[in-house]
């Protein structure tokens, strides 16, 4: 390592970024080299340059704040005597072994016949008999009867509406013997109609399920007499036992750091205000592989611990080996620290929860020893774009009906949505670790949508899964615009299709098999609807272009006329409209009955509902096309990536909207032209579909504008209770987000290399703490040489991650950059500071403030 003399201006610049008093700075300014500077900071004049720069990490980190870190007992040393921050508790490993999946029924039978079985797993318990289990089974049989009966009646009406009614006249012997073209002409219309009828039945049954779910949810919320609600099993004020320790875990990956730690701080402070902080620990579990964001996370963790005095309560861990995505992140936590906690609450990066809500969840778990998971119903809030505010309004107004309805049908065999829920640790560790799906292709490998699977495994192991749909204090955020929502939907679509491979896995409860099926239908309904419309258009073309076949069998005495029953068409259309829109109307009726002030009043909430209904009708065909593409992409094995540009105001640029929605617009125009050519009168029926596709570009762009969203808020449109009377947790989150953005750390990796204090923090939080070994030293030397040669702009991601994880290499790179005054690194660092007027420059202590001496020689 170079030990050249330090330029006075470089040394002064270096010292200016350490929070020193004037006396300390003047004392250290007499150093003739950076090697001497690090020796004096470390208090060891005889140390080599390599040893000194590593030893100076502690003084550089603690100068001005040593007492704070020492009082919290945050400073420690690793096995090689290097300083480190205690950013996580001591590891106490627990065995976490996923059970291999046997998804093929035939292979499973063969293995059983040949005497081969899986490795023994922890014994599963039987869920104790309870009245709710019998009631739930009866309710689900009733639901199935209602859905099938309603679908059969609608199918009968649909069959009567279709024009061709001659299947009974088709003679199969005649079909086989006649020319192929005659067979096609004769059978084609009836084959089309049969396909349309089958698709209609599937889609109508899906709509029927949603209708009955919303209707029962409406009755539950209106009467308030749900004796099976899980939240009624606790008094709500009993003290939490000391052994009921709970870990709040927040898995993150390349997230918006200011918002993440603002929500974490608001949640932490709310728990502290509840008086139960000693029962909770907080873990930020990072899978971030962007080094700039990773360094920003480190600084944000230190800041939030200082601001809340959360040292020893708020922990941070960034994985170096990112396996199995989010489920692997949780597995890693369970393996390292899960045995120390009785419960775990999983938070999303945008989650906020009140201390009372979290305390209530723990009390409910204590009161229900057979519950494995209790899921809250998060309220969407905090967004300002027009699109997000309409979605917030929809989920806040209609969502409670569907959530309460799900609880009515499922009771203790319900959903888990992956966040804002409490989990019993022991059965989760023993039974809910997820093995990769076997095989090759798009539907093999790590499970993407882990939440439904974990709920199914928890129930299979004999534990209940409940929705506490009426528990307040649980919040989340929604995507700000349509394209961001669709980007998320693509991942969810692939995950739900993968999960269906588990439909026949041994031991799954029928309810959770149905959950896998509904998860698939959430996205498969889109291509089914699309093909239904395509086949309907094909039937129109057939009816228009092909000569009707009035006589389709030999010696037929009377012609078979195409039929039209307008009364059946009107009845079926009216019924479908009722099923689709009555839940929205029931939601408004419920709000009128309970009080509409928090939603802007009766008139405004009704007007908002009508506007949201129109907007959802505009977007439904757009989502249909995208979801159809997502399903096809999953089956064809196309990569599920979607790179959108960074947007400061969350708005969609016109260029991106044209690129994403352009093909849909062309499809809508071509489809409308075809139908107009075939039968102009039919265009009125198809206008809502093709019109939405044609308008998709401006609708996507305009709805993403924050200005329109705020204007609607000023007019009390799409108002939600969290905006009318904002909870303290959301107010705090908004305040801390603004503060964090003002002081956000940019170009984090460059600062971790160059900045004296940031480098010390990164070295103290680095986790690759290897001993001395020749291969490791050779690898370090190679990485250092590469970093010096190519500079920050040319350094690849793998090398960046390796350097950030290695405290020795990072300290050496820091020393070498300053010793050689490497312009490639220092100039980028200076530019980063100059371009960021709110950069968190370290404060310089006043000259009259006493500081401990840093000079050791």
Curated annotation (Swiss-Prot):
Could you tell me which InterPro entries the record lists for this protein? Glucans_biosynth_gluTrFase_H, Glyco_trans_2-like, Glycosyltr_2/OpgH_subfam, Nucleotide-diphossugar_trans
Enzyme class, spelled out: transferase
What name does this protein carry? Glucans biosynthesis glucosyltransferase H
The text of the family note is: Belongs to the glycosyltransferase 2 family. OpgH subfamily.
Would you tell me the Gene Ontology cellular component terms?
A: plasma membrane
Transmembrane parts of this sequence: 142-162, 196-216, 515-535, 572-592, 606-626, 682-702
Q: What does this protein do?
A: Involved in the biosynthesis of osmoregulated periplasmic glucans (OPGs).
Keywords for this protein? Cell inner membrane, Cell membrane, Glycosyltransferase, Membrane, Transferase, Transmembrane, Transmembrane helix
GO BP of this protein: glucan biosynthetic process
Q: In which pathway does it act?
A: Glycan metabolism; osmoregulated periplasmic glucan (OPG) biosynthesis
Does this entry carry the keyword Glycosyltransferase? yes
Q: What is its EC number?
A: 2.4.1.-
Cell location: Cell inner membrane
Membrane topology, as annotated: Multi-pass membrane protein
Molecular functions (GO terms): hexosyltransferase activity
């Amino acid at each position: 390592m170079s030990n050249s003399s330090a330029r006075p201006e470089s040394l002064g610049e270096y010292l200016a970024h350490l929070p020193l008093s004037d006396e300390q700075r003047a004392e250290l300014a007499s150093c003739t080299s950076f090697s001497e500077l690090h020796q004096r900071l470390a208090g060891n004049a005889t140390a080599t340059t390599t040893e000194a720069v590593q030893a100076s990490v502690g003084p550089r980190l603690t100068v001005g704040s040593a007492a704070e870190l020492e009082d919290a007992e945050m400073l420690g040393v690793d096995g090689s005597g290097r300083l480190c921050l205690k950013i996580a508790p001591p590891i106490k490993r627990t065995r976490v072994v996923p059970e291999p999946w046997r998804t093929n029924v035939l292979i499973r039978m063969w293995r059983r016949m040949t005497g081969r079985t899986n490795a023994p797993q922890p014994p599963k318990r039987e869920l104790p008999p309870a009245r709710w289990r019998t009631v739930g089974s009866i309710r689900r049989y009733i639901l199935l009867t209602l859905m099938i009966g309603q679908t059969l009646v609608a199918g009968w009406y649909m069959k009567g509406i279709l024009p061709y009614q001659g299947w009974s006249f088709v003679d199969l012997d005649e079909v086989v013997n006649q020319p192929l073209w005659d067979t096609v002409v004769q059978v084609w219309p009836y084959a089309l109609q049969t396909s349309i009828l089958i698709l209609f039945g599937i889609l109508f049954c899906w709509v029927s399920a949603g209708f009955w779910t919303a209707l029962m949810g409406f009755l539950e919320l209106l009467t308030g007499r749900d004796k099976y609600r899980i939240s009624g099993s606790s008094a709500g004020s009993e003290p939490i036992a000391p052994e009921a320790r709970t870990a709040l875990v927040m898995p993150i990956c390349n997230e918006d750091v200011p918002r993440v730690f603002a929500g974490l701080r608001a949640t932490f402070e709310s728990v502290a205000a509840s008086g139960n902080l000693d029962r909770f620990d907080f873990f930020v579990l990072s899978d971030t592989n962007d080094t700039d964001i990773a360094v920003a996370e480190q600084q944000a963790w230190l800041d939030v611990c200082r601001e809340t005095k959360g040292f020893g309560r708020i922990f941070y861990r960034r994985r170096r080996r990112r396996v199995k995505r989010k489920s692997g992140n949780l597995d890693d936590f369970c393996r390292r620290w899960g045995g120390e906690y009785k419960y775990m609450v999983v938070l999303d990066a945008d989650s906020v929860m009140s201390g009372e809500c979290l305390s209530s969840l723990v009390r409910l778990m204590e009161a229900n020893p057979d519950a494995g998971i209790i899921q809250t119903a998060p309220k969407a809030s905090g967004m300002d774009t027009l699109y997000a505010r309409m979605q917030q309004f929809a989920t806040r107004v209609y969502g409670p009906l569907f959530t309460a309805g799900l609880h009515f049908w499922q009771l203790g065999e319900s959903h888990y949505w992956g966040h804002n829920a409490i989990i019993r640790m022991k059965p989760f560790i023993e039974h809910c670790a997820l093995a990769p799906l076997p095989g090759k292709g798009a539907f093999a490998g790590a499970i993407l949508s882990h939440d439904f699977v974990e709920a199914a495994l928890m129930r299979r192991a004999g534990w209940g899964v409940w929705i506490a749909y009426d528990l307040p204090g649980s919040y989340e955020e929604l995507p700000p615009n349509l394209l961001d929502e669709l980007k998320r939907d693509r991942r969810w679509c692939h995950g739900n299709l993968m999960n269906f491979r588990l439909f026949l896995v041994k031991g799954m409860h029928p309810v959770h098999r149905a959950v896998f099926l509904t998860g698939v239908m959430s996205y498969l309904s889109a291509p089914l609807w699309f093909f239904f419309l395509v086949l309907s258009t094909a039937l129109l073309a057939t009816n228009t272009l092909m000569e009707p076949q009035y006589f389709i069998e030999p010696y037929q005495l009377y012609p078979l006329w195409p039929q039209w029953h307008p009364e059946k068409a009107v009845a079926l259309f009216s019924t479908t409209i009722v099923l689709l829109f009555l839940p929205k109307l029931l939601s408004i009726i419920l709000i009128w009955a309970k009080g509409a002030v928090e939603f802007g009043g009766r008139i405004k909430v009704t007007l908002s509902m009508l506007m949201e209904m129109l907007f959802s009708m505009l977007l439904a065909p757009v989502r249909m096309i995208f979801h159809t593409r997502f399903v096809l992409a999953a089956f064809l094995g196309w990569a599920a990536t979607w790179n959108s540009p960074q947007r400061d105001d969350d708005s969609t640029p016109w260029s991106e909207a044209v690129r994403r929605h352009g093909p849909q617009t062309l499809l809508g125009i071509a489809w409308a032209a075809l139908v107009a050519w075939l039968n102009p009168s039919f265009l009125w029926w198809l206008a809502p579909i093709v019109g939405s596709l044609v308008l998709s570009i401006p609708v996507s762009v305009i709805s993403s504008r924050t200005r329109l969203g705020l204007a609607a808020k000023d007019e009390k449109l799409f108002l939600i209770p969290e905006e009318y009377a904002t909870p303290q947790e959301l107010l705090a989150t908004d305040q801390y987000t603004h503060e964090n953005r003002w002081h956000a750390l940019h170009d984090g990796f460059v600062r971790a290399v160059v900045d004296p204090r940031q480098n010390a923090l990164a070295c103290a939080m680095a986790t690759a703490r290897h001993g001395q070994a020749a291969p490791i030293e050779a690898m370090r030397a190679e990485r250092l040489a590469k970093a010096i040669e190519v500079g920050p702009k040319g350094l690849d991601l793998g090398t960046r991650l390796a350097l950030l994880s290695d405290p020795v290499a990072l300290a050496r790179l820091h020393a070498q950059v300053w010793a050689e005054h490497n312009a490639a690194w220092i100039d980028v660092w200076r530019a980063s500071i100059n371009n960021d007027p709110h950069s968190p420059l370290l404060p310089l202590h006043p000259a009259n403030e006493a500081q401990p001496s840093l000079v050791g020689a």
